[in-house]
Amino acid sequence: MKNSFEIDRNHLLTLVRQELETSQSFQKNIDGAVQHFLANPYNAQGFTDGIRFNHEYLQVYLNRAAAMLELVGCFDAENETADYPTLSRRLDELSN
């Protein structure tokens, strides 16, 4: 009988990769907002709202990627930071 919680490794890697790619789009939005604000420092409230929104979603996607990597034992949330470089490195380790 097939285990109902069996994880398809390739599908999981694809999902993690998608989560990391999406997180980077939010990081690019943050970087763009910073550059725009430095050039036009007149709308501080819009700047902070945009940063807050994008940062929250950035963290959501990074946390989901971390949770998936934790499922296969490739990430230790207690001792590692769920940031892009760490998660990307773990994904590369799993892919090889």
Question: Whereabouts are the PLM-identified features?
Answer:
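Acidic, low-complexity, intrinsically disordered interaction modules
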Residues: 35-85
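Short intrinsically disordered terminal tails
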Residues: 1-7, 89-96
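Short, charge/polar-rich alpha-helical segments
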Residues: 2-23
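Non-transmembrane amphipathic alpha-helical segments
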Residues: 19-33, 68
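Intrinsically disordered, low-complexity regions enriched in serine, threonine, proline
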Residues: 6, 14, 49, 86-87
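Intrinsic disorder/low-complexity segments in short proteins, especially the signal peptide
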Residues: 17-18, 25, 74, 92, ...
